[in-house]
Swiss-Prot record:
Equilibrium between an active dimeric form, an inactive hexameric form and higher aggregates. Interconversion between the various forms is largely reversible and is influenced by the natural substrates and inhibitors of the enzyme. GO terms for molecular function: ATP binding; ATP phosphoribosyltransferase activity; magnesium ion binding. This is ATP phosphoribosyltransferase. Its cofactor is Mg(2+). Pfam families: HisG, HisG_C.
Length: 299
């Protein structure tokens, strides 16, 4: 029996989203042993319980108030939301924030030899998918009539097996589609992982813990997207150098011992520093340019 005074977070039991969710929690300083194949894990240093479940169960656990938070792909969340609305329910939850991992796209794919000039080509066809509600929402807007063939796996084999004329499935590189004689013809939904919270009253202690967690998540994401830059630069070219680094905060300027014409610059940049930018910095007289990753960050 779970202690209801502890914060309950649902996450994918296994898979890419599970690995990235574990990394996020770890970088937030939450110590949890997730190596053992247990459905429930307990944080050592915070009143947090982790429920490890199938990803398509997570939206329902949050919407039904079984857990407080869930880390889930937007595609799975949207499918469950549309499913419940189709049944006359009014699902309630909050999206706390979009995360910086779990990116994917849901696409229509047709046989390589099929002519495709737009969604209207799918009129009166049979389409295999694991996302019937997202597919219906998209094709209804296009005015396309179709029949849905619900499959929970191996969707890409449906056309060859004679089950469907086309498919709607998650795509990464497209290699699996090509191996099954298919090609991606239309992206209908783009998704990333997100953190969602149940509706309803939350205890003061839980809400304070969620606020702390959100601050840490924000810091982790900012750190991933930022770099710490150090260099020596000529004093008379500082404005030009700063212009080359959009998104950078105002730099810290330090004098160099024995060289009054140059300074040391330290700054945090939210922009990716490409080789071309570094070459331009060097052309302006910068030297000893270091670009370092940031582990943690808090504004």
């Amino acid at each position: 029996m779970l202690d209801k005074t502890r914060l309950r977070i649902a996450m994918q039991k296994s898979g890419r989203l599970s690995d990235e969710s574990q990394e996020l929690l770890s970088r937030c300083g939450i110590k949890i042993n997730l190596q053992q194949q247990r459905l429930i894990a307990f944080a050592e240093n915070m009143p947090i319980d982790i429920l490890r479940v199938r990803d398509d169960d997570i939206p329902g656990l949050v919407m039904d108030g079984v857990v407080d938070l869930g880390i889930i792909g937007e595609n799975v969340l949207e499918e469950e939301l549309l499913n419940r609305r189709a049944q006359g329910d009014d699902p309630r939850y909050f999206t706390l924030r979009r995360l910086d991992f779990g990116g994917c796209r849901l696409s229509l794919a047709a046989p390589l030899d099929a002519e495709y000039t737009g969604p209207q080509c799918l009129q009166d066809t049979r389409i295999a998918t694991s996302y019937p509600h997202i597919l219906k929402q998209y094709l209804d807007k296009q005015g396309v009539r179709f029949k849905s063939c619900l499959l929970n796996g191996s969707v890409e084999v449906a056309p060859r097996a004679g089950l469907a004329d086309a498919i709607c499935d998650l795509v990464s590189t497209g290699a699996t589609l090509e191996a099954n004689g298919l090609r991606e013809v239309e992206v209908i939904y783009r998704s990333k992982a997100c953190l969602i919270q149940r509706d309803g009253e939350m205890s003061v202690d839980k809400q304070q813990l969620i606020d702390r967690l959100m601050t840490r998540i924000q810091g982790v994401i900012q750190a991933r997207e930022s770099k710490y830059i150090m260099m020596h630069a000529p004093s008379e070219r500082l404005d030009e150098i700063i212009t080359l680094l959009p998104g950078a905060e105002r730099p810290t300027i330090l004098p160099l011992a024995g060289d009054k014409s140059r300074v040391a610059m330290h700054m945090v940049s939210s922009e990716t520093l490409f080789w071309e930018t570094m070459e331009k910095l060097k052309a302006l007289g910068a030297s000893s340019i270091l670009v370092l990753p940031i582990e943690k960050m808090m504004e």
